[in-house]
Amino acid sequence: DLITFGSPLTHAEFLLARSKNDLEARQKDRELATCPPIGEVLDEWQLEHARAIGLLEEGQASLSAFPDRQVKDGWTLHHGAAFAVVRWTNVHDHAKFIFCGDLISGPLSPAFGQGIEDRDLAKIDKQSASFTHTRYWSADQSRERLTTFRNAINVLDED
């Protein structure tokens, strides 16, 4: 599990790249990882092999892995698949105006992929009345927010 609270990665198009197009190009080139990973279009022999061992369904042509020649029927995730085996939960507090909520954070799934579960505290509880970027763990959180934090962390992996 990866849990981010108040992550500035919502602004990745200027924190990690020169523009939204540059960010997308870097992700496509696997310089920056996405969740789920961007698949690699496989060669015909790789496609046949992947389908034969059940890794791909008919019609699919890409995979986030490549054949591992040292292991029979083994495949290895490519370097851009860092989040392939990760459950990513992003908790943020939607900002209204400058000082209500967390202007620094925001949803991550639009920039990094639909494998990220974004949890907006303003929708779970109510709009914050003050700046909250450094207050996620303050003792005066509402019951709804504390429950959201506990469920995101879910150390015992309970449903």
Regions found by a protein language model. Name each.
Residues 1-159:
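Lipid deacylating catalytic domains
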